[in-house]
Amino acid sequence: MLLRQYINVPRLGEIMNLKELTVILIIPIVYLGVCGCFEIVPKSFYDNFSSYNVGDKAPFGEWKVKEGGFKIEAILSEDKKTLNKVAVPINNGIIYIDKNYTDFKFIVDIKRLEESDSPKIYFRLINNANAGYYIDIEGFDRGYVLYKFNGTKVEKLAESYDAAPAGTDFYRYEVVAKDNKIIFLAGGQKYIEYTDNNTPILKGGIGIGGGRAYYDNVRVEPIE
């Protein structure tokens, strides 16, 4: 009697209430997962292609192929002292990371093979990269153009007739996407700022390719 007096032994009704509470807590979580209402924000992403072998062809790592092909090559660093692995399109190929980034900074280093080349930067890609936005880095440093596309439909949204003097050197390009505003920078200088008020795409993956160039140091950083 004394032992039972000091030990809190749960009654049957209390056990049932605990089970009911567990069910009540689990059902909404399962529902959120099934309906897609609950979504985990993707973490930051970085790839300098050093973990792959020279000659590897996409898909590799987290990269998927949208069209054409991509391969890993080794080229001399800018100081010509070491070999550096980079990603190169095959037949103007495009590869992409299939994640739902909403607000983010997307940074990539690009080096044209020839001054006439026009590589591209893709972002907020959806539907297996069949829709989204891209920046066209025009050849001969003529400028930059922001496009929105859906399948074969392509719409020019904004452009800059000024451009950084990249030539055939590695240059750092950056896209900042927050809500429906898009900012494009080259070498830290802003060249395009555009607000898409016509059914904007507010989340999606990122991609590279669409023109002859070396790509390196691809980075995506979510922003608040």
Curated annotation (Swiss-Prot):
Q: Name one GO molecular function term.
A: hydrolase activity
Give the UniProt entry's GO cellular component terms: membrane
Membrane topology, as annotated: Single-pass membrane protein
Task: Give the domain of life.
Answer: Archaea
| Keyword Nuclease applies | no
Q: Which UniProt keywords apply?
A: Membrane, Transmembrane, Transmembrane helix
InterPro entries membership: 3-keto-disaccharide_hydrolase (IPR010496)
Tell me where the transmembrane regions lie: 21-41
Is Membrane found in the keyword set? yes
UniProt cross-references to Pfam families, sorted A to Z: 3keto-disac_hyd (PF06439)
Its predominant location is membrane
Cellular compartment(s): Membrane
Q: Which residues form a coiled coil?
A: none
Q: What is this protein called?
A: Uncharacterized protein MJ0945
Recite the lineage of the species.
Archaea, Methanobacteriati, Methanobacteriota, Methanomada group, Methanococci
